[in-house]
Amino acid sequence: MKVFSRKNALLLAALLIALAAACAFALSRAQTAVMLEETAFAPDAERDAMTVSLEATEDLRTIKGEMRLTATNRTGGDFSEIVLRAYANAIQPGSVTLSDAKVNGERASIGADSDDPSVWRIETPWRAGETAEVCWRVSLIVPRGEGAIGRTDESALLIGALPTPAMWENGAWRTDGYDELVGTSYGQAMDVRMTLTVPNGVQAAFGGAWVGARDNGDGTRTLTMQLSGAREISLALRTKGAMRQTTVDGVLVTALAQNARTASRLLDIAADALEDIGQLGLAYPFPSLTVAQAKTARADGAVGSALIAVDADAKTDALLSRVTRLCARQIFGVQVENDPWNAPWLSETPASCVELLAYRRREGEAAYEKRFYGEIEIATRLTRPRGVTIGASTERFGGDGEMTQVLRDAGAAGLMGIEQAVGQAAFLGALQRYVEQNAGGFGTLEAFEAALEQATGSDWSGYLADMLAS
């Protein structure tokens, strides 16, 4: 009979330890969702709050329920109406129906504009400084197709599909026509708490953290989720698939994908992206991040509050770059919002700079220069149609590919020119100042210029003017 040697015994012990570690790792990323211990929101004098109670059908086609908004009129003027945006109706008319509106417990008239069904108006007097309790019933038939709002046979992505208040700017409600290049997350920061009832076979992930779950004993379960500082409501659903979770520097990361392997891959890449951003001294703004596998018809993917959606088919390096940019857009574009029709470069361009700086830190100067001059700087030397510039409104761009090339690549090349002139520390200091001074609000070119001047001691307004116009 063959006897184990000491060497074989040690190898066997090492194998058993590795197996136990692998099992523990698998259990740590099991399908049972990790709950964050967060208390219910307290009233906030600076932010409105929304409570949502929804039910989803097993085929992901229909979502319905009640939405309740507690909002204060901080504009200084009196209103005769409250305007909501329901962008799913711009994608597929009739997708969203609102009914049974009440303001402070009294019934109110509600209806959609005849020429733009994504614009809904609740008629009610709303005086300056007054806080109103507004509620309505909502029924959403999720449009079929790819995009930030859409569904397939096995999944649904809802970034800004549910109605939220329109922006009030310059004495009027913003009711710009839907633009697929703009996205659907333009709104005041608010605190959202949602309960979602789904069939047991349906996986759900919210742009925010799960704080509770209940088995209803009837083949459904009710999930409770919340997020402070959301610009819209973002949600991803799957009838088949896998969910994996981990924690990175206190941020709960959730990946929802078509299978366990893809979910684990997205989770690892998102964790690397958050670590890279943190090592640059920039803080991810939310306690949670959801990464959803989805085809969004966008080069990088789609962004909602604390949720990103990305196609997982790319190679690892390319996917890491995309996810890093999308995570950085949680800072530039959600935490600091900007006018997505007329100043989209304030989100995509600085996010691209963050990704390039992370790439240089990770791969080294030689690899960075090869990529920068081979892929990024070349965008500044390409001929484009008249008016298609970094500073142009979205109506100038012919499609997502053109907009990506101009905003992400040519724009990043321009800003990285400033970084080369002042050094990484000063440039990152400017980005940090810009975020700190505008967090929860809205960024502008003037605010960006001011942050650059404060951090570098130089006036870059002329440089930026030339960059935006060229």
Describe each model-derived feature in a short phrase.
Residues A366-Y368, M403-S470:
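Amphipathic alpha-helical substructures
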Residues T70-Q92, D179-T184, Q188-P199, E446:
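Surface-exposed beta-strand/loop patches in extracellular or lumenal glycoproteins
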Residues M194, A242-A343:
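Juxtacatalytic substrate-recognition/specificity segment
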Residues R74, M190-Q203, M225-A230, Q258-L289, ...:
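Zn2+-dependent metallopeptidase catalytic core
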Residues R137-S234, K240:
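Extended, low-hydrophobicity, Ser/Thr/Pro/Gly-biased non-transmembrane segments
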Residues N8-K64:
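N-terminal, polar/Ser/Thr-rich
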Residues A90-S155, G219:
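A surface-exposed beta-strand-loop module
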Residues A273, I277, A306-D313, A343-G387, ...:
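Post-HExxH zinc-binding segment in Zn-dependent metallohydrolases
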